[in-house]
Structure formats: C-alpha cells, structure tokens
Amino acid sequence: MKHHLCSVLFTVAFFTAFAAGSQCAPPDARAWKAGVASVVITPEKALWMAGYASRNKPAEGKETDLHAKALALEDAQGTRLVVVTLDLIGVPRALRKNLEKRCGEAYKLPPEGLLLNASHTHSGPEFRVDRAPWDDGNLKPTRDGEAYGELLEGRLFQLIGEALDKLSPAKLGYSHARAGFAMNRRLPTPKGYQNSPNPDGPVDQSVPVLRVEGEDGKLRAVVFGYACHNTSLALYKWNADYAGYAQEFVQAEHPGTVALFMMGCGGDQNPYPRKTVEMAQQHGRALANAVETALSVAPREVNGPLRSAYGEVDLDYDV
C-alpha cells in the first residue's frame, strides 16, 4: 500500500566559500553581523512525553531545563538567516508555518531565512496534536499539548526578534572534530533488522563546529552538530539528554557564550551505552570535548555571501 509523507520541511543554508586566510576573500565577504539569544521552554505542567510508545503517564518533573536558542546572521548585502535550535522531539508543520508568517510580517524574514532544528530528545513534551496520547477518551492531554504549543510559539517569536535585535559585527570560523559514542542501531538478523547495537554498520561521528566571535575577539556563540538520537534516557522527567549536557559543558568552559546543538542525520544511530543520567552526562562530556578540540585549532574563515533555500517535498513510501 502506497502512502505519502507530505510536506517534509527542510531549510538549507550554506556559505559559498571557506577561506584559509583573510586574503582569499574581498573585505565585504567578511562583513558579518551576528546576534544570539536563549530562552527556557521547559513545560510548567505535567505533560505527556514524546518519543517512546511504551510511556503510560505524564512527566513527573524535570532533571534539566529545556531550551530554545537562536543565532541570527546577516551578510554584507543584508541577507539574513536565523538558526533556531530546540530541545524538543521535532518541529510540527503548524508551528513552522505560524512562525514563518509572524516573522515575515514583523521582522521581514523570508521562509528561507528561518531554520528550525530540534535535538530529537525523547525526554521532552509531546505537543504534536496528531500524536498526543489518549487517556481513556479524555482529551485533556491533547488540550494541554495544544496550550504548550501556543506558549512555545510565542516564546520562539520573541526569541527570534531578540537575536535579530542583537545583530552586531562578528567573525565566523569553521572547524570540526569527532565523537565516538554514536553507533549504528540497525542489526541484521535472519528474521530481519532489529533495533540493537551494530558496530559494523555505517556511522557518522563527525562534529562540525561554527564559532562566532565579536569584534573584540571574544567567543559569542558556538554552533555544533552530531548525528545521533538523543535517547540516552527513558525516564519520566524533562531532560535535554546528551545534547543538553554538552551545551552546558561548553558554556561553562566559555562564560558568556551561547552553545547551540544541531541534530544531524542520526536516524539509524543511537548513543551507547545508555539508560542512566550518568551515561547521558558522559556522552555530553564526550561531545563537549570534541567541540573543545575543534575550537583549539585554527578555523577556516567563513565568508559570504549567505545563501539559503527552503522547500517542501512529498515522500512516497510503501507499507
């Protein structure tokens, strides 16, 4: 039976040139502005949690706060891009569309100028209404999820505006490292694939890092990525998982800096070992160490102009 997974959203932002030295690009290609902001998005109510079908009750408090963070970039021609990272399972289409409309009207930000990236933590709230759990026919979980989604939209709208308001001259640099805790989770067996560690399967353990420095040379923001499920935990408490701990460690090492985590293509990769807070912290420390390694080497200067693209596609699949 053929189905369509409609409106898969993607935003692609890329820089047209990486230069090893400033002499490789004209001065206006290096005339960046950047602004960064952060806000707590931890639910205040005991909402149901997203990610694991076996859960049978709402969250029972928090282990860590959940955050949304925004990095606004502007090149010499005035082209803007706002990167928003979220400690959430994903980004519902309705949330994306509502923010597009509001940011377009208030901030003159086009759809291709807004990049939303969720860490895919399985210890965050379930606010996707079409996936909300049912409690013996009681619609309260759905209504609570809708209310959280409305609150979240408002906070993200303000967050984006704050990052844009903080735009000031900046310098961008790229470097990378590796972290080894992600492992392929598709284990072939005589009966088909099962969700288990597969050390022989394909894996992406790269850690790309974008550093943002002010005119004074001080580090203002660090954007780093990793392709791995945020599934170190399966508790009934809010937790940003290894990605959240990694951001905390980086920010502690660089006071005044905002660290942003971007999830890569980690659908077939899990963190191993897992199941405890200590393991999530261990993976977070490993990822933070990789970021520090990348920051310790001379970066490639990132030059403009800035280009981005946005589109929606239909994906055919059979079941």
Indicate where each model-derived feature is located.
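Conserved beta-alpha junction segments in alpha/beta enzyme cores
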Residues: 25-258, 262-282, 295, 302-319
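Sec/Tat signal peptide C-region and signal peptidase I cleavage site
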Residues: 18-26
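N-terminal secretory signal peptides that target proteins for export/translocation
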Residues: 1-4
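Bacterial N-terminal signal peptides
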Residues: 6-19
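Anionic-ligand-binding alpha/beta catalytic cores of soluble enzymes and soluble regulatory domains
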Residues: 287
